[in-house]
Amino acid sequence: MYEQAIVIRNDLKMGKGKMAAQACHASIQAFLHAQKISSSAVSGWMNEGQKKVVLKVNSEKELLEIFKNVNIEGLPCSLIRDAGRTQIEPGSLTAVGIGPEKEEKISKVTKDLKLL
């Protein structure tokens, strides 16, 4: 089975709409990266219904650690930096998108995270 994981910073106290927008940015950017490096995973994910899991971290440090580990594993990913036009400071790191890729590959990095 394939999935995509989106990891959101919970400490920024973004509103629900802002959080949803950041998750969408992370999802789309990771998907575009996956198209370039893992087209078979993208095809499998599309055929299986495009499962997404949204998880949380509580600091920028935790978010960067996830992003580092995702890159070490060679998974398609994205790191989202907010423009700062609305609720949070410009340049704030808000989310990481991972995949689509096989669930077991993503869970190597995300297994200890809680659902948002």
UniProtKB/Swiss-Prot annotation:
One of its GO terms (cellular component) is cytosol. Keywords: Cytoplasm, Hydrolase. GO terms for molecular function: peptidyl-tRNA hydrolase activity. It catalyses: an N-acyl-L-alpha-aminoacyl-tRNA + H2O = an N-acyl-L-amino acid + a tRNA + H(+). One of its GO terms (biological process) is translation. Signal peptide: none annotated. Transmembrane segments: none annotated. The keyword Cytoplasm applies. It is found in: Cytoplasm. The keyword Hydrolase applies. Its EC number is 3.1.1.29. The natural substrate for this enzyme may be peptidyl-tRNAs which drop off the ribosome during protein synthesis. This is Peptidyl-tRNA hydrolase. It comes from Methanococcus maripaludis (strain C5 / ATCC BAA-1333).
